[in-house]
Amino acid sequence: MTEETCWRAAENGHLECLKYAHQNGCPWNEWTCIYAAINGHLECLKYAHENGCPWGIRTCEYATKNGQLECLKYAYENGCPWDKNTCTDAAKRGHLECLKYAHENGCSWDELTCIYAARNDHIECVKYAHENGCPCHKKFISTIVQKILIPKWRDSVKSRQIIIYWMERSAQTSCAENGRARIEDMNSFENDCNSLIV
């Protein structure tokens, strides 16, 4: 038996097989916890952790890849480390509840959280991240709109929603920074976007 025996058992949620392998001297490594987390096999994750299986940043990161909120919670609440990739992967895959949980429990994030959420049409993740202080500077917003969203404009209602959301927020920021109000007609904005892709 090798380390693969344990992570294959965890990957498929075979708790009794995992227990048997471990109790009979089969080695395991961080991948046992990772595969349990990404596939939502909480009992396998608990057993592995409680019996000394190592875990690390990738355990939380991989839990968010498939929206495995309970595995993410268990890992974090039991001392598993995380980093900004946890938020990035949650946003990239549209797992809003994982993104909220990570952020509200102090997980860091950066511009990639907004960029990947927008690139993949996850408007709720874009809104949540932006409205909760995720850094997304104007140059990144411009890049998102010009290089990612406008080419998708015809094919995706969500892309339109994200562009409109960014433009509304950008207008609000400009008003606050310049001390004057300037409201753009969104129909005019939509016509401009449509003319760029015709």
Where are these regions (language model features)?
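Ankyrin repeat (ANK) tandem alpha-helical domains that serve as protein-protein interaction scaffolds
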Residues: 1-198
